[in-house]
Curated annotation (Swiss-Prot):
Induction (record text): By Pseudomonas syringae pv tomato strain DC3000 infection.
Protein name: Mitogen-activated protein kinase kinase 3
Species of provenance: Arabidopsis thaliana
Source superkingdom: Eukaryota
Gene: MKK3
Disruption phenotype: More sensitive to Pseudomonas syringae pv. tomato DC3000 infection. Hypersensitivity to abscisic acid (ABA) in germination and root elongation. Short roots with abnormal twisting (e.g. leftward skewing) in media containing microtubule-disrupting drugs (e.g. oryzalin).
Length: 520
């Protein structure tokens, strides 16, 4: 009991009797926001400057004064109306993450949505935006594509690289544990990202855990979720706030002592322990106080030496030193025998990740999203239709009515003629697609062949039958309650050969065949 009382005394500035542990001490006391009549949100922070969000994107300013337009530094054009948003792929305490297709470049992204009216979430948003803006395109961190504000929902959406292999936490749910050679390759690349955060950006992440370590189907692991990271002026500076996931928190942070980069090394060691053994080394289901007492009082956990290599055990032991000064840096860990031992084996991380999850469901989800994207463009507003041209390359082929068109310009012209014919001169004459059947099969490396079969009806919006991926703003076919046969004015069959691009989530149409029958 004495230990418990001592812990509570140490944490008293951070403990709220009604709400439990609070992270309020991490907030910028000068954080505020302004909402203009024009639908622009100005997030202001003495620490970070001004970030202006509206439906057209994000503008980052160097000055802390909103009216100093000449201080504008960077603009990210990522508009809300250019996003085709699908269902949620995850959620956390402060945000929801959804898949989306960015219409201008036809790339699948992850949209992280955050409510701006809660101060703590607003501070986390500022921190994450700042980190992502100042660490562009580093191979160990998820890519940032922009952000925008939606007045109707009061949310700011951050557009991020879509990591289609999920997180290490997702992988553990399927495999229970990850082999050492795979972990060596994974953590080699993750350490490079962490080294960049610490050594170049001078940031303590403060929430390293399997759920925040992502990987794509190309086998590229990356660190995400920078909402509670903290900046330090130099390598000797220290933090003094209590935020992050208690489960992976270092002893010095639990004691409410000042801390620095070694806190992330402890969390990384626990994450590796869990990934390698398949078990979290502490009892985590008896409440946060009990867990923190274990971390403070129990000896640091070590893997069973009879089951794991000496190099793996040594790496874990080095990370989980109670004394933060005794832990190695991320740079030093890159030279650890556990990392260097497997360098010559060239573990194929892409093959490993692709073997984990059901490829059938992944393929079906991809086919659903790309089908919705294409027909929503075709049957949608004219101001977005021109983006369809970039779905094709100069070697793409489109076939219709015995004619073959090659290249993006020819194909777009042919499709525009068909689209104009189906649209008619009056709204009452517009024909739209209803996809009644959708078939798909894999094609090449990451591609898919899609065959859509359906009807034309008079209407103003594309529809798709079935229980697959749903898109925001697209009505459910079941809820409409009408019989397609009674409104059918023609049928169509269309086949698409979709190939993946160089970037994750980027696709183009290599071949397309269209057949229209019984059109009155």
């Amino acid at each position: 009991m004495a230990a418990l009382e001592e812990l509570k005394k140490k944490l008293s500035p951070l403990f709220d009797a009604e709400k439990g542990f609070s992270s309020s001490s991490s907030l910028d006391p000068n954080d505020s926001y302004l909402l203009s009549d024009g639908g622009t949100v100005n997030l202001l922070s003495r620490s970070y400057g001004v970030y202006n969000f509206n439906e057209l994107g994000l503008q980052k300013c160097t000055s802390s004064h909103v009216d100093e337009s000449e201080s504008s530094e960077t603009t990210y054009q990522c508009a809300s109306h250019e996003m085709r948003v699908f269902g949620a792929i995850g959620s956390g305490a402060s945000s929801v993450v959804q898949r989306a297709i960015h219409i201008p470049n036809h790339r699948i992204l992850a949209l992280k949505k955050i409510n701006i009216f809660e101060r703590e979430k607003r501070q986390q948003l500022l921190t994450e935006i700042r980190t992502l803006c100042e660490a562009p395109c580093h191979e160990g961190l998820v890519d940032f594509h922009g952000a925008f504000y939606s007045p109707d929902s009061g949310q700011i959406s951050i557009a991020l690289e879509y990591m289609n292999g999920g997180s290490l936490a997702d992988i553990l749910k399927v495999t229970k544990k990850i082999p050492e050679p795979v972990l060596s390759s994974l953590f080699h690349k993750l350490l490079q990202g962490l080294s960049y955060l610490h050594g170049v950006r001078h940031l303590v992440h403060r929430d390293i855990k399997p759920a925040n370590l992502l990987i794509n189907l190309k086998g590229e692991p990356k660190i995400t979720d920078f909402g509670i990271s903290a900046g330090l002026e130099n390598s000797m500076a220290m933090c003094a706030t209590f935020v992050g996931t208690v489960t992976y928190m270092s002893p010095e942070r639990i004691r409410n002592d000042s801390y620095s980069y070694p806190a992330d090394i402890w969390s990384l060691g626990l994450a590796l322990f869990e990934c390698g053994t398949g078990e979290f080394p502490y009892i985590a289901n008896e409440g946060p106080v009990n867990l923190m007492l274990q971390i403070l009082d129990d000896p640091s956990p070590t893997p069973p030496k009879q089951e794991f290599s000496p190099e793996f055990c040594s790496f874990i032991d080095a990370c989980l030193q109670k004394d933060p000064d005794a832990r190695p840096t991320a740079d030093q860990l890159l030279s650890h025998p556990f990392i260097t031992k497997h360098e010559k084996e060239r573990v194929d991380l892409a093959t490993f990740v692709q073997s984990i999850f059901d490829p059938t469901q992944r393929l079906k989800d991809l086919a659903d999203m790309l089908t919705i994207h294409y027909y929503s463009l075709f049957d949608g507003f004219d101001d977005l239709w021109h983006h369809a041209k970039s779905l094709y390359t100069e070697t793409s082929v489109f076939s219709f009515s015995g004619k073959h068109n090659t290249g993006s310009t020819e194909i777009f012209s042919a499709l525009s003629d068909i689209r104009n014919t189906l649209t008619g001169d009056l709204p009452s004459e517009k024909l739209v697609h209803v996809v009644e059947k959708l078939h798909c099969k894999p094609c090449g490396s990451g591609g898919v062949i899609i065959r859509a079969v359906g009807s034309f009806i008079v209407g103003n919006q594309f529809l798709i039958c079935g229980d697959g991926v749903q898109a925001e703003g697209l009505p459910s076919f079941k809820d409409l309650g009408f019989d397609v046969a009674s409104r059918r004015v023609g049928r169509f069959q269309e086949q698409f050969v979709v190939e993946s691009g160089d970037l994750i989530g980027k696709y183009f149409l290599a071949k397309q065949e269209l057949y229209i029958t019984n059109l009155d």
